[in-house]
């Protein structure tokens, strides 16, 4: 929290309400945090850290809902400024922004600045990923990077390659990038390297590729995020040319020999 206090949310304090010098933070049984400002002049910033293998929903003082994926960090104020609403994201989050044309909602990442007034969209911006992407489900979004502004309409995606700094705008099916918040992994022609990063954040495991070919193999499919790691491995081995070997918290991956 802004005053240096740390609160660890768990099953032990479900339903608790914490008073943070003018801000009440409550958690319900669906792992949703609610922020209730007591003093409208308080503009300190708090940080929500979502652990690996975890996820949280956050309802801000203005009514905006944020679904934060595992391994993510979100900084947000107790109370927004009068002319804008600014939060900072590192990781992945889905935003359902409360409409307020007079106070645009701005998400800052290490790469870009995403500006909306009221809409639904997903941002993926993990430090260890080689890309950043913004996927719009509803409304409109402006992505600003190094002086350039990119406007998105529903079903469009902004994709930044961090290494080459190439930016691609494309038509996509938003559900492929937002279904995680509803408890479902969806992949469409995704290479094993990027797929392994998503899986490792959820199951808190490490992937070790035995050869470069395995990293480039692609997978399309869906499975429940509540599935065990063993169930995930069975699904992957039955539908791909990949062999998985689990040793402790490390999964060794190699291509099946034909």
Cite the ranges covered by each PLM segment:
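A residue-level detector for the "anchor" residue at the start of short, highly conserved motifs
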Residues: 1-258
């Amino acid at each position: 929290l802004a005053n240096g206090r740390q609160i660890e949310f768990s099953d032990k304090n479900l339903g608790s309400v914490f008073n943070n010098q003018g801000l009440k933070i409550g958690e319900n049984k669906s792992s949703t945090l609610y922020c209730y400002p007591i003093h409208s002049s308080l503009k300190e910033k708090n940080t929500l850290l979502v652990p690996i293998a975890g996820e949280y929903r956050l309802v801000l003082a203005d009514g905006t809902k944020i679904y934060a994926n595992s391994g993510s960090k979100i900084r947000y104020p107790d109370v927004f400024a009068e002319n804008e609403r600014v939060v900072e994201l590192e990781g992945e989050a889905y935003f359902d922004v409360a409409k307020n044309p007079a106070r645009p909602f701005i998400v800052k990442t290490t790469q870009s600045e995403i500006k909306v007034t009221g809409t639904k969209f997903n941002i993926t911006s993990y430090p260890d990923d080689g890309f950043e992407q913004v996927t719009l489900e509803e409304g409109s979004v402006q992505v600003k990077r190094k002086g350039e502004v990119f406007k998105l309409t529903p079903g469009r995606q902004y994709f930044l390659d961090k290494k080459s700094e190439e930016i691609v705008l494309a038509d996509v099916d938003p559900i492929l990038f937002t279904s995680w918040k509803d408890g479902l992994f969806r992949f469409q022609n995704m290479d094993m390297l990027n797929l392994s990063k998503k899986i490792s954040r959820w199951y808190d495991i490490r992937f070790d590729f035995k050869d470069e070919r395995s990293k480039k193999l692609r997978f399309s499919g869906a499975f429940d995020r509540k599935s065990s790691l063993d169930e995930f491995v069975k699904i992957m081995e039955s539908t791909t040319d990949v062999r998985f070997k689990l040793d402790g918290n490390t999964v060794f991956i190699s291509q099946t020999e034909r």
